[in-house]
Amino acid sequence: MILKEYTEKRKFERTPEPKPGPGLEAGRLLFVVHKHAARAMHYDLRLELEGVLKSWAVPKGPSLDPSLKRLAVMVEDHPFEYKDFEGVIPEGNYGSGSVIIWDRGYYHHPFARTDGENEKLLLEGLQKGNLKFVLEGEKLHGEFALVRTGTEGKSWLLLK
């Protein structure tokens, strides 16, 4: 089942978070950054890819300073519907706390010329552990990279 880990961690009768829905239409790929006041304040970077939001928790948040490297821990995929989520996840639920949209927009691979080539290059980068992308957001803009720090681990670095 797609989004199995996401679904297993949530009690949808007790949280306002969205359930996974049907597929989505093709076009430009979206990104969203959530500011999440959970047990510890952090930011969640979510990139639309393969019909879901690939997600990383970024404890110190993204930076526009190229000299800074930010830890980014890959977490479970989220449903595409999560792109619009803001609200309070009630106490006792996974990820309880306040969630707001901090930034959103579109993103693409820096060398892609078509939508098909874009997703292909992004997927290749994700699988290789070196994902390069250009954000076109309200706050974040320019070229970024997510670089995996081990061969199969969940720890990545977010670089500008």
Indicate residue ranges for each PLM-predicted region.
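A charge-rich, low-complexity, intrinsically flexible signal that marks solvent-exposed coils, linkers
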Residues: 1-160
